[in-house]
């Protein structure tokens, strides 16, 4: 049996850990609310944008549509893997990397990978057979302007497809790894909310300049930026939720450990007192 001093020190250390996990849980809860608000605004915007593009494309023939969507066959993919810079969020980072590894079918294509998040890079840098791998840290601090600069600095025309792996937020306890293709543009997207998008109709828009090709090209380019930014917000919200749940679980575990240690401490203390009493009584009888 451990000594009272050892038990007391262990209880003190675990209480210190419990304070840390409680603070992290509260911070994650506050960040979760903030990221949910940003995600809600982003989802409304991208859903409306997707609906407008879908409606405008109804008036475009297939030849012009292929030109607008910049469909190419250059033999290469660009892949973004969105995760976190930090740990202590359960299997959040490892699950998205594992999902990406399982779902990324290259068909012999050259693949350039961009990891948005240090942890994803650390876990996945040796798992992908890719000659070009880039890491971007502080993924949660990336703003819309940063994404615009990032996408603007990439020649998307040299890629057949641009894919994004991210963690989609459903609720506090449910986040699922997802794969979204943001180039070429698709009428189906996991990033949009159909209840927010509105109906897709061909009743006709009035637009200036009266050049449907120019307008659609601009909107599709904007959509790539917004889609990547939305994936980052989905991932940040999922991360905050996963960390909050992980810290809540850690708090429960520390409570259980503290209860067991308190019981063990009391028993050890009681045994020590009993031993002392026996020694005192034995000493008195010898007199």
From Swiss-Prot:
Biological process terms in GO annotation: proton motive force-driven plasma membrane ATP synthesis
Main location group: membrane
Record-linked SUPFAM superfamilies: ATP synthase (F1-ATPase), gamma subunit (SSF52943)
Residue runs in coiled coils: none
Gene3D superfamilies: 3.40.1380.10, ATP synthase, gamma subunit, helix hairpin domain (1.10.287.80)
Molecular function via GO: ATP binding; proton-transporting ATP synthase activity, rotational mechanism
A Pfam family: ATP-synt
NCBIfam families given in the database record: ATPsyn_F1gamma
Role played: Produces ATP from ADP in the presence of a proton gradient across the membrane. The gamma chain is believed to be important in regulating ATPase activity and the flow of protons through the CF(0) complex.
Protein name, UniProt field: ATP synthase gamma chain
């Amino acid at each position: 049996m451990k000594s009272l001093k050892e038990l007391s020190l262990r209880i003190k250390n675990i209480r210190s850990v419990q304070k840390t996990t409680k603070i992290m849980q509260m911070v994650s809860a506050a960040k979760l609310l903030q990221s949910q608000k940003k995600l809600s605004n982003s989802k409304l915007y991208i859903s409306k944008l997707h609906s407008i593009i879908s409606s405008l494309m109804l008036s475009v023939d297939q030849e012009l549509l292929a030109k607008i969507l910049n469909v190419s066959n250059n033999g290469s993919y660009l892949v973004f893997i969105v995760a976190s810079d930090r740990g202590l969020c359960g299997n959040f980072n490892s699950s998205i990397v594992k999902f990406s590894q399982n779902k990324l079918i290259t068909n012999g294509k050259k693949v350039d990978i961009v990891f948005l998040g240090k942890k994803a890079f650390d876990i996945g840098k040796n798992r992908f057979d890719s000659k070009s791998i880039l890491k971007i840290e502080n993924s949660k601090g990336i703003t819309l302007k940063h994404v615009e600069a990032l996408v603007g600095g990439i020649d998307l025309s040299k890629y057949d497809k641009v894919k994004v792996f991210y963690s989609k937020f459903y609720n506090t306890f449910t986040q699922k790894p997802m794969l979204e293709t943001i180039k070429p543009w698709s009428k189906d997207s996991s990033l949009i909310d159909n209840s927010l998008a509105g109906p897709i109709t061909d009743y006709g828009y009035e637009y200036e300049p009266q050049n449907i090709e120019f307008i659609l090209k601009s909107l599709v380019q904007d959509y790539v930026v917004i889609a990547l930014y939305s994936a980052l917000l989905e991932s940040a919200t999922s991360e905050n939720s996963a960390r909050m749940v992980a810290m809540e679980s850690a708090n429960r575990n520390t409570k259980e450990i503290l209860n067991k240690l308190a019981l063990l401490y009391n028993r050890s203390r009681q045994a020590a007192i009993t031993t002392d009493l026996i020694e005192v009584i034995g000493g008195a009888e010898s007199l």
